[in-house]
A protein has these predicted regions:
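Histidine-rich, glycine-flanked metal-binding segment
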Residues: 5-52
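Divalent metal-binding segments
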Residues: 59-68, 87-99, 119-131, 146-157, ...
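Histidine/acidic residue-rich metal-binding segments in metalloenzymes
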Residues: 131-298
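Gly/Ser/Thr-rich active-site loops/lids in small-molecule metabolic enzymes
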Residues: 206, 316-333
Length: 340
């Protein structure tokens, strides 16, 4: 493979160069390798060469919503985007809140060519009221816990869940959108929402829960993942609490550091998602968070819907999109390997 941009996690380097492969093994990486006449040459000019990517935030819609996607088609989409390991969220139907559902998913996942991990839900039926049997679910193969798609509104319940996760030494991941602030979710409250004639979701809906959960993380000692950050102020909060010793892991999506809410004016419902695309200032703050390590995870939050669902009016359609392909199409000048 010649003329590629080679990302090497083992050496934490990015170089332009060539890779020699023999018998399915990498033999040599160098700035330039002269091939023999018998060797196949792949020109990787303008392409990134990297190990298989890990996407820690995926919705394969299986079980329950397989008209949108299932484990097999989702796995194909992941591989096409260069992703070879995924973590699936628990908001399926039935919810991954018990061992039989978890075991069914993990068993079917073995047939796929990528590696699939499954998170279990924090609460039964994603209601935020009763903890699942986290110990049993971990022993059955759950890699972590999340009610992603729905926030944990009760602070005491959230703290209890963090304490349990800490005792089991597993991460707990949180969707941070307080519905009390929101009308017409999926659209940032601001100049664009005013043009569209809707109220939308102000950034305080995210920031208020991020502030709360950063403190709960600090006090509980749990490994807490703040999912799909969309607000610059959220980045500031996480930076501050990390400095105080909170075991926080912050996640950003490609769409939140490459697009703004202006995309709604051009793309309509295709640019509607939870949390919403926000302002240019928020986008730049997320990039700064990636640069300085405040944000330490890039994940797609791949969440496909059917074409019929996305074709509904702006205030009715489902929020979400197929995002695994975004990993192949981040605009030049904005990709993490160029800026971080």
């Amino acid at each position: 493979i010649k003329n590629g941009t080679i990302m090497n996690p083992a050496t934490q380097t990015i170089i332009s160069g060539d890779i020699l492969i023999e018998d399915d093994k990498i033999i040599k990486i160098a700035a330039s390798i002269t091939p023999s006449e018998s060797e196949e040459v792949i020109d990787a000019s303008g392409l990134v060469i990297a190990p298989g990517l890990i996407d820690t935030h995926i919705h394969f819609r299986d079980p329950g919503f397989t008209y949108k996607e299932d484990i097999h088609t989702g796995s194909l989409s992941a591989a096409h985007g260069g992703v070879t390991t995924v973590i699936c969220m628990a908001n399926t139907s039935p919810t991954v809140d018990n061992v039989p559902v978890l075991e069914d998913i993990l068993q079917r996942a073995k047939a796929e060519d990528i590696r699939i991990y499954q998170a279990a839900s924090i609460s039964h039926s994603l209601k935020g009221e009763t903890l699942t049997d986290m110990k049993a679910l971990k022993e059955a193969g759950a890699c972590g816990f999340t009610d992603d798609g729905i926030p944990l509104k009760n602070a005491a319940f959230c703290y209890k869940a963090m304490e349990e996760a800490a005792s089991l030494n597993v991460p707990i991941s949180l969707h941070e959108e307080d519905p009390a602030f929101i009308t017409n979710n999926g659209i940032n409250h601001g100049d664009v929402s005013e043009k569209l004639g809707v109220y939308g979701s102000p950034s305080i809906a995210e920031e208020s829960l991020v502030a709360r959960d950063c403190m709960l993380a600090l006090r509980s000692g749990a490994d807490v993942v703040i999912q799909h950050i969309s607000s610059g102020r959220s980045v500031e909060l996480i930076r501050m609490f990390k400095a105080q010793g909170a075991k926080l892991h912050a996640e950003a999506t490609p769409h939140h550091f490459t697009l703004t809410d202006e995309a709604l004016l051009e793309h309509g419902t295709l640019a509607k998602m939870n949390p919403p695309l926000r302002t240019e200032a928020d986008r730049l703050a997320i990039i700064e968070g990636l640069k300085d390590g405040t944000i330490d995870l890039i994940a797609t939050d791949h969440a496909p819907h059917s074409a019929e669902e996305k074709a509904k009016p702006l205030t009715e359609e489902k929020r979400g999109s197929d995002r695994l392909f975004l990993l192949r199409s981040v605009p030049a000048g904005l990709s993490p390997h160029e800026q971080v």
